[in-house]
Amino acid sequence: MIKYILLVVLLTSSLEGLKLHKKRTNFENVPKFKTLYTDQYLDHFNKRDDRTYKQRFLVNDEWFNPNDGPVFFYAGNEGDIESFWNNTGFMFDIAPVFQALVVFPEHRYYGESLPFGDSSFDQDKIGFLSVEQTMADYAVLLTKLQQDYNLCRKKNPIIAFGGSYGGILAAYMRYKYPNIVRGALAASAPIYLTAGLAPSTLFFQDVTNDFDKEPGCVPLVRQAFDAMENAAKQGDYKLLSEKFKLCEPISDAAGYKHLLLWMRNAFTIMAMVDYPYPASFLGDLPAWPVRFACQQLVNDTAKGVDILSSFKNLASILYNDTSKCFDIYEQFIECADPTSCGLGNDAKSWDYQACTELNTVQETNGVSDMFPVISYNEELREQYCLKTWGVKVRKEWPSIQFWGKHIKTATNIVFSNGLLDPWHNGGPLTNVSDSLVAVIIEDGAHHLDLRGSDPNDPQSVKIARYLEIEQIIKWIEEARKEPCEKF
Ligand SMILES: *[C@@H]1O[C@H](CO)[C@@H](O)[C@H](O)[C@H]1NC(C)=O
Ligand SMILES: *[C@@H]1O[C@H](CO)[C@@H](O)[C@H](O)[C@H]1NC(C)=O
Ligand SMILES: *[C@@H]1O[C@H](CO)[C@@H](O)[C@H](O)[C@H]1NC(C)=O
Ligand SMILES: *[C@@H]1O[C@H](CO)[C@@H](O)[C@H](O)[C@H]1NC(C)=O
């Protein structure tokens, strides 16, 4: 106990002190890692199929105390695992104090962990991508690590961390494998929304709310979308292509829809990563990008720049126009997830997941949000998914498999949410029980709490991290009371 009081003191002083001056945005102080690979069954659930694939994982054991140090496990989500390593500084701020082993496994079908290389995304190969298979990968790898490092199952407890879909996975790991994971920090994990249990207008309404905090912004955004609609109605695709400096001019309604989606996505991303300092997570963005974008829009129009050009300037805060034009098809991919599938191969895998287990049926109506009407519903999702992946959507399955809103029999999970994050209303915002704790970060965007501490951090995220550390300590203390059990 005394050790832990000391630990808390140490931790808070180290968080408030020297480490605050780390410059996370340039990755200058991102700790080193070893890149390792492990063989995993392609299909954990069909015992007649013994094919395997190579899963990548990153490890740091420089602070690890094998006697009773915990294992900090990041539940890799939809992307290159190195990018999550670079953007999850909170774990590295606290790992040395906890003397933890840090492990980041990569999610199958993302980054380098492609079971069939570039043909992994063929209809007959993609079927091994699922939440269940991924969790089984993690459970198997964590068990192997416990054996390799000769750990006690109890005295070296495994704590799961994750942000966004990674947060969902962290929570699910605790539901499904409590024998392996002692507790989970699920940051910005919209578990209800992705189970299809939220209204379809929720997400973009909350994107709008973020921009509505900036004076004069939303009316200008509406005016700009109206100007786009007017041009499109008159068939003036030439004007739009010129004003938006498109590399490949649009010439029809389909092209125009893509332009709208690309534009809407700029708002989505800026709202999600509305961090208090410049960051390179889903793009290279300035501090408080929502405020920056709004001020620039207000400034531009005040200077007499026409509304469409001002709007294009706003988009260029997020999107590159290095070749002096925008390739909207390169920069935004339309898919089953209107909140964005990301880019490249990762977007293909996420598209498939959005068709199978993660329901992100969200749409805009121009009333509860500031965007043009872009409808999306279960029927459209079904048509798209059948056509693209040959899968029939099973809408109820996520709630059956992962409990829907009936989560109170789970224990030891922190659900943290930032109120600037457009996903926050999709997850638990109140305490469910003594050990299912909700942490609210008033000035936090998408999993700000998982990022490394920064001099510009608002007070609310410092308090949130403190509450999270308290819970983690509780889980570890609980574990240490129990005898050592080896595998
Ligand atoms: C992570 O950061 C390192 C620098 O520490 C950088 O070289 C690398 O490109 C980054 N990786 C990703 C995927 O962002
Ligand atoms: C912008 O373009 C540069 C140079 O082509 C590239 O290195 C960078 O990754 C691009 N950034 C984004 C956010 O696409
Ligand atoms: C907008 O104009 C204000 C007042 O001139 C200035 O302080 C601010 O930096 C400008 N912001 C942007 C993003 O252009
Ligand atoms: C949940 O309970 C913890 C104490 O266990 C408290 O600090 C926190 O504020 C509560 N969360 C909410 C959203 O009320």
Predicted features by range, described:
Residues 2-101, 112, 121, 420, ...:
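Catalytic-loop region of hydrolases
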Residues 109-124, 449:
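Glycine-rich "HGGG/HGxG" loop immediately N-terminal to the catalytic nucleophile
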Residues 125-149:
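Alpha/beta-hydrolase active-site loop
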Residues 151-165:
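Alpha/beta-hydrolase fold nucleophile elbow
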Residues 163, 169-351:
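Alpha/beta-hydrolase
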Residues 322, 329-398:
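Small-residue-rich helix-loop
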Residues 409, 415-417:
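Short beta-strand/loop motif that positions the catalytic acidic residue
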Residues 417-418, 422-427:
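Conserved alpha/beta-hydrolase "acid-adjacent" motif
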